[in-house]
Structures are given as structure tokens and as C-alpha cells.
Amino acid sequence: MRKLMLGMIVSLILLCLTACNPALDSDTEQPDETAQIERHSNEGHGIPWFEGSVAEAFNLAAAANKPIFMYWGAVWCPPCQEIKHTVFKSPEFIAQSKLFIPIYLDGDTERAQSVGEEFGVKGYPTMIIFSPQGEEVTRIPGGIDISRYNSILLSSLDTLRPTRMLVQLALNSPDQLLASDFRQLAYYSWGQDFEALPVGTDPILFSQLAERVSNQDPEASARLYLQYLVMLAAGQDEAKTRQKADAAPLTRILAAPELIIGTWDYLAYYAIEIASVLDLDALALARLQNQWQQAMLDLRHNKRLSTAEQLAGWFPYLGFYFDGDATPATLPTAQITAIRLDA
């Protein structure tokens, strides 16, 4: 189990970075609301957020043959603020918003929570693309840079191939997957949709997908392999025998700055989990962890990363530093100073 006794410094980082859990509890006090989805003019200038109800938005999408972009957020959610001040203000996203019906849902309202329950929303921010017929196409994760976000969005809008269909193809007819399908699977928000995969899906599926696309799309391959490691780690508690995975693909990722940026969310938020399933002896694992944390710290000020993701560059260092310590040591003064400057 992770044992991070990081005091006030890491509490600040966690406040800025942790994906927010939705308050889908009907007993909690809710703010006043209207029956309409209100226009949020300050949440992204130039985006024509739909002003009617969700049902009206789906009816309009069907009539106009336009897909739907549905966003759940909350004013108190730091990652949501990052999305609003980066993605929603980018000229690319504003231009793309003319291609779909954009819906903004304030997660603190009872109506939004009801819609969230209907579509299985597990946390904030959540962004889902629906086809004009109302079928869910994909869920886009937070924690990726703006250029990648916009390219994934545009690709999903172009193909409108539902992720659940792609999963079935991956399981049964992988030769029928398109290049864009691999990228959609690689950038799907798996952690926010527990039903996208059939129950009991073997994590090895993602390793196999990573191998298939390794030459034509190294970034998608890297993300798919890291998803394999995350799923492998998640299933270890239930497994009778503990499985170990090849560390070579991760080593190659950590040696390529562009791949590090492209897999930043995995490398930052799942460091402990991924490291726990690598087939390495203690010395080799320590070397890889050193390479991992140094690579993230070296790139944390990359301009393509949001402020929150730049701060997340500290997670591997902090996680490896404190992991397993019954009585955690004090962080070096130089690192405390650096974290404070970044925050």
C-alpha cells in the first residue's frame, strides 16, 4: 500500500491535481438551479454551449446530424479549472465546437447529477462524445496537453466509432481496427468508465494492442502498454499468483522525451502501481525509478503541460521516495524549495 506522508506540501499538490469525485448523493444540499442548462459564458469564450435541456440537446443533435460533446465539471474542482482555462480557450477547440452540440453540466446541480448517474460519470472532469443518434463514442481523459486533446477530439468526431465496438473488435477481430481506432483506445478515459471492458477482460489485451501499433504509432503503443501495466497492477490483489511484466517498453518510453509527454498522465499518477508489476530485481528497479523520476522532473516545465500537470511531475519522485517507509524520512531541503517554487 502506498504510504505517502507528505505533509502540507503534497497536500497542496494533491488538491491541485487529484481528479474530483462527483457528489452523486441526493441527500446532499444542492444549489438552486433552473430546468435549463445554463450558458457558461465565462467558461470558454466563443463556445456556443447549448442552453436547453439535455433531452433537447440530443433531439437537436439527431435533427441536425451533429455529434454531442458533453462536459461535466464543478467550480471547486481544480482539474476542471485547468480544462476551462486551457482546452476551452484554445482556438482549435473553439473552432471544433462548431462541429458538434456542446453541453456544459455543472456537477453541483441535482439535474447534472441525475444525468451523471444515467451515463455512469465517476468523477470530474468527464468529457463524453456521443453520435448524432445518441450512442456514446468515447470519453476523453484530462491530464493531456491541448494539442493532443484537440487531435483526439477531432479524430473521434471524424470516425464516430464507439469505443465499446472497438473493444469487441480488439477482442475478436483485431485486424479490422483502423489506425485511428488504436489511438482512440490509447486515449480513452478507462479510469472513468468501468463498463467499457467486458468483465474479466485479460490485461494482456492492451499489451497485444501495443505490439500491433508499435511501428506506426509509438505514442499510442506506449499508452496502451502502460494501460496494460495499470490493469495488471489493479488485478494483483485478486490474483492467486502475482504476474510480472516486461520493463523494456517502459525503459524505451523513459528514454524518449516526446513519449514521456504523450504518456504523462500514466507516468505521473500510476508510478507506484506500474513499478509494482515490473519484472526487475531490486537493483534494476531502483535504477529505473531513478531514471523515471529524473525524466519527469527534467520535463515538468514543458510549455505544453498545464500548471497542474507540471506539478504532477513531482509525483514519481515523491511516490518512490516515501513508498514503503513505515516512518517516512524528511524530504531534502532543496526538493522542498523546488516544490514550493513550482506550486
Predicted regions and their residues:
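Oxidative protein folding and maturation machinery
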Residues: Q176-A343
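A short beta-strand-turn-helix
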Residues: W49-P67
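Non-catalytic, surface beta->alpha helical segment in thiol-disulfide oxidoreductase systems
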Residues: K122-P162
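Short active-site neighborhood of thiol/selenol oxidoreductases, capturing the structured segment around
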Residues: A64-C77
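Thiol-based oxidoreductase modules, predominantly thioredoxin-like and allied folds used
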Residues: I47-G52, W72-A74, T86-A112, V121-Y124
